[in-house]
Amino acid sequence: MSLRDPNVTNPKHHKRVAIVISNPAVSTTTKWPVGFWWSELTHPYFAFTEAGYDVEIFSPEGGTCEADGMSDPRDASGYSSSDLISMGFIATPKLAALVTDTRPVASIDVSKFDAIVVAGGQAPMFSFARATGLHAKFAAFHAAGKVAAALCHGVAILA
């Protein structure tokens, strides 16, 4: 199984997953720019696409999203330097482009997706509490009996 030859469980119905990452924010504590966490996007993206699922990336407002610096495997801190999945995603132009033009959460049609996954990072702690459109979509997935998952600081949507 690979990205080129996915093992599709049901060829007539590809499962579809919406992954939501945060728009850029500024920490009210440190005053530093914060964003989504690379591995909380890239690892689920890799797992789902390897299983043959179609994955689309969204953000509350749409547009370009920025990752937290320390989540970048190339960051001088070395904090995430062993994250080869994120490095591969970042180094692949087609994949890296997915975070430069995200669609807004408002455009998610719950009936056309099987799951929603909300990635974490530091920005969700400063932006998801007021992302009422994201709250509504997440609740709609849950109400429809679909998978609704929030990773790490992505649980800030529950505040």
What do these predicted ranges mean?
Residues 1-144, 157-159:
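Extended, subdomain-level signal for the structured scaffold at the beginning of enzyme domains
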Residues 153-155:
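Rossmann-fold NAD(P)-binding glycine/threonine-rich loop
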Residues 148-149:
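Structural detector of well-ordered beta-strand residues that form the stable sheet scaffold
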